């Protein structure tokens, strides 16, 4: 089921985020403007990834300073699991139980479902719609709520996204 794939994807995405940050020198295979591509061989996985250009955290309508882990937006290919172009987002904190993340790309909105510190679209079809919007858009704004009630708004540049998504797909597409 797609939800089971999400759960497996969550574990892999967490591992990838760590790998992306900790082993950038050895795993990064391409970069363009605000996006990069990482590749690992066993099992073969490729992902295009970007970090936000701006983050705003609010509680009760006031801007607050909070500690967050890595904040990343991914597009991932895992050929051995038949995953192609899976969108995922980590906000660097546990999301509020049962909450969703709103992704706004140049006025087109999408809903991502949360589990732990990660969020994904509901279906592979939705992944593809988001990828199309990313390729046409200038930025993506992701709004979410933490388990502590903090509202977060992360703005990601989409400059370089098309080239890096296509690069990752070429490396790992089936």
Tell where the protein language model's regions lie, with residue ranges.
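Bacterial N-terminal signal peptides that target proteins for export
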Residues: 1-10
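Sec/Tat signal peptide C-region and signal peptidase I cleavage site
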Residues: 16-22
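A generic "folded-domain core" signal
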Residues: 22-174
């Amino acid at each position: 089921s797609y939800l089971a794939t999400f759960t497996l994807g969550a574990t892999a995405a967490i591992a990838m985020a760590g790998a992306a940050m900790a082993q950038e020198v050895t795993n990064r295979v391409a970069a363009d403007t605000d996006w990069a591509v990482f590749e690992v061989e066993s099992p073969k996985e490729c992902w295009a990834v970007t970090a936000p250009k701006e983050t705003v955290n609010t509680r009760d309508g006031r801007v607050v300073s909070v500690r967050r882990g890595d904040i990343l937006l991914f597009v991932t290919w895992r050929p051995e699991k038949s995953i192609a172009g899976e969108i995922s987002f980590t906000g660097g904190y546990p999301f509020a139980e049962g909450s969703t993340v709103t992704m706004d790309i140049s006025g087109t909105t999408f809903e991502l479902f949360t589990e732990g510190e990660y969020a994904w679209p509901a279906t592979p079809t939705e992944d593809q719609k988001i990828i199309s919007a990313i390729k046409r858009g200038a930025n993506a704004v992701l709004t979410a709520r933490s388990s502590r009630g903090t509202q977060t708004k992360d703005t990601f540049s989409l400059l370089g996204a098309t080239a890096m998504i296509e690069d990752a797909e070429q490396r790992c597409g089936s």
